[in-house]
Amino acid sequence: MDNEAIRTYALKSGEGRTYNYGIDFTVKAGELGPGRRVAVLEYTTRSGEEPPQHTHTTEDEIFYVLQGALTFRCGDDTFDVEDGGFIFLPRGIEHGYSIRSAGDVRLLVITSPSQPDATGGWGGFVGDLETQGEPA
């Protein structure tokens, strides 16, 4: 890994690069650039905007619920996760979520490893945001 190309930085609440890709996603740590091994996004969603059940073949996904309540399905298991809750979704297992709370749900999502050159699925999604998303 080329650590010289990576610099230390801190972001305040609400900071990051925000792109609209149907909904606004704020990139806290992107996929583009040498040495990237993790991608971190914050976004707000609501009932009706949930993704379909899907599988990531190359990366694990971690959700930290900043606000709201969701039900996650991962394989045959179901988990209720609320404010301050965390869920780890391993690669290779079909998963998705449904929103249980009224109003906005705020999520911090971490994927590892990031996949800037991947096509399809989550792999490369953050890189796509950074190159194709409309700045919000």
Q: How should each PLM-predicted stretch be described?
A:
Residues 27, 41-56:
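Conserved short histidine dyad/triad with adjacent acidic residue
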Residues 1-38, 127, 132, 136:
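A short, N-terminal "cap"/entry segment at the start of jelly-roll beta-barrel domains
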Residues 32, 49, 57, 69-70:
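Hydrophobic small-molecule pocket/channel-lining residues, especially in calycin-type beta-barrels
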Residues 58-70, 75:
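Glycine- and acidic-residue-biased ligand/ion/polar-headgroup-sensing regions
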Residues 33-34, 58, 102-103:
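Short strand-connecting beta-turns/loops that link adjacent beta-strands
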Residues 100-136:
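Double-stranded beta-helix
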Residues 9-12, 76-94:
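Short acidic-glycine-tyrosine-enriched beta hairpin
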Residues 53, 72-73, 89, 95-101, ...:
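Short beta-strand His + acidic residue motifs that chelate non-heme Fe in jelly-roll/DSBH
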